[in-house]
Amino acid sequence: MSEPIRLTQYSHGAGCGCKISPKVLDVILAESGTQALDPKLWVGNASRDDAAVYALDDERGVVSTTDFFMPIVDDPYDFGRIAATNAISDIYAMGGDPLMAIAILGWPVNVLPPEVAREVIRGGRAVCAEAGIPLAGGHSIDAPEPIFGLAVTGVVSKRHLKRNDTASAGCQLYLTKPLGIGILTTAEKKAKLRVQDQGLARDWMCTLNTPGSRFGKLDGVKAMTDVTGFGLLGHLVELAEGSGLTAHLNYAAVPRLPSVDHYLAEGCIPGGTLRNYDSYGHKISALSDDQKHLLCDPQTSGGLLVAVAPEGEAEFLAVAAELGLKLSPIGKLVERQSHAVEVI
């Protein structure tokens, strides 16, 4: 009997941990030319937001995003589900609703059977169906490593559009999914994942960030982004710095997956963790190793980071509870201080 195929053994990276580090990305983009100004482009790349938004008319905009990566789990169907969930998340993070998706597939056709790729596509299609959108087509190439993701198109009302650089002082910070996805998936890749922890990270990664669409309609939500490959600290730096503020982050209040401490002790630290710290560490107060390893852990299909004004908190928490989310604040935004993020 042949051994089951372990997709993670065919890639050098995993999930959003494959991202080029922000430090290197800055070099790539610095001399690549400037974008011509277009007043209809409501959101471009200036603030490294989750998606681009282009005006359809004075009230509505089309939301466009793409996201793809190498396998973060061994099962091909789950890989497809996770990649699709992660890609669609960007639409929700802007406060929008997805309309359709196009698949992006790279496959080592001389190494892995096409039937395995078929399972990846099947997983992606299942998530699109769950989100209520068609997987309308796609493009594929012969590639040295498996790659899958989506280009997703959505729509958003201008008054409900949420950006990552529009928070205000006094906003409370909320996170809708626990951290530690990169740590547990690294444990799986190293064959160190305990039986009782199997499926924990997968289930979170396959949970759509649909609450973002509802949060977008709340005036008390001042800024929103999803936490992915740059870790909570990286995305929080971008939110705080972009808004001209400092975030006070309560480390003890940050939700995390069970057994994170066990796997950190086993050395299950993704390579992206240290790349994230190298890119953002100078903008953050001093951290212990444990804080660094959790807060810089690259998330794949992570949760929504939401900045909520005090006057809107009650309504926000009521909507969150209605959607099955039991949330507590993990920090607060204050007037700008010496660091973009102070961990307390």
Swiss-Prot record:
GO MF, one annotated term: magnesium ion binding
Disulfide-bonded cysteines: none
Species annotation: Pseudomonas putida (strain ATCC 47054 / DSM 6125 / CFBP 8728 / NCIMB 11950 / KT2440)
InterPro entries: PurM-like_C_dom (IPR010918), PurM-like_C_sf (IPR036676), PurM-like_N (IPR016188), PurM-like_N_sf (IPR036921), SelD_I (IPR023061), SPS/SelD (IPR004536)
Function according to Swiss-Prot or TrEMBL: Synthesizes selenophosphate from selenide and ATP.
Positions in coiled-coil regions: none
Oligomer and partners: Homodimer.
Record's keyword terms, sorted: ATP-binding, Kinase, Magnesium, Metal-binding, Nucleotide-binding, Selenium, Transferase
Top EC group: transferase
Pfam families in the record: AIRS, AIRS_C
Catalysed reactions, semicolon-separated: hydrogenselenide + ATP + H2O = selenophosphate + AMP + phosphate + 2 H(+)
UniProt-annotated binding residues for Mg(2+): D50, D90, D226
Name of this protein: Selenide, water dikinase
A biological process from GO: selenocysteine biosynthetic process
Required cofactor names: Mg(2+)
Magnesium in keyword set: yes
NCBIfam families xrefs: PRK00943.1 (NF002098), selD (TIGR00476)
